[in-house]
Amino acid sequence: MAKKSMIEREKKRQKLVNKYAVKRKELKEQIKTSVSFEERFKLQLELQKLPRNSSPTRLHNRCSVTGRPKGYYRDFGLSRHVLREMAHECLLPGVTKSSW
């Protein structure tokens, strides 16, 4: 189980990303379409003034049960350990153990 502070920190980052997503997208579009160097530079400075944690690059996928950051399965939102346990207990519909 991950530390609660790390899980909360990741939730806080997700809120910031959602809050500033529209503004960040608009600024990036303006930077792409601007012609003059001065205007582009001014827009770039404005983009840099946004909070650092509002960038989607700083997000890290975590297991929704344990908060584990590694071995994350995007389709389920779970780490490999929890996925295996839940699959064995038939808690994930449509997931079967493979055999050939």
From Swiss-Prot:
Keywords on record = Chloroplast, Plastid, Ribonucleoprotein, Ribosomal protein, RNA-binding, rRNA-binding
PROSITE patterns linked: RIBOSOMAL_S14
Is Plastid tagged as a keyword? yes
Q: Where are the transmembrane segments?
A: none
Entry's Gene Ontology cellular component terms: chloroplast; small ribosomal subunit
Localization, per the record, is:
Plastid, Chloroplast
Q: What's a BP term from Gene Ontology annotated to this protein?
A: translation
**Which Pfam family, any one, appears in the UniProt record?**
Ribosomal_S14
Say which domain of life the source belongs to: Eukaryota
What are the recorded GO MF terms, alphabetically?
rRNA binding; structural constituent of ribosome
Query: Which family does this protein fall into?
Result: Belongs to the universal ribosomal protein uS14 family.
Please describe what this protein does: Binds 16S rRNA, required for the assembly of 30S particles.
Q: How does it assemble?
A: Part of the 30S ribosomal subunit.
Query: Which PANTHER family does the entry link to?
Result: 30S RIBOSOMAL PROTEIN S14, SMALL RIBOSOMAL SUBUNIT PROTEIN US14M
Task: Tell me the protein's name.
Answer: Small ribosomal subunit protein uS14c
Look up and give the organism this protein is from. Answer: Mesostigma viride (Green alga)
Organism lineage reads as: Eukaryota, Viridiplantae, Streptophyta, Mesostigmatophyceae, Mesostigmatales
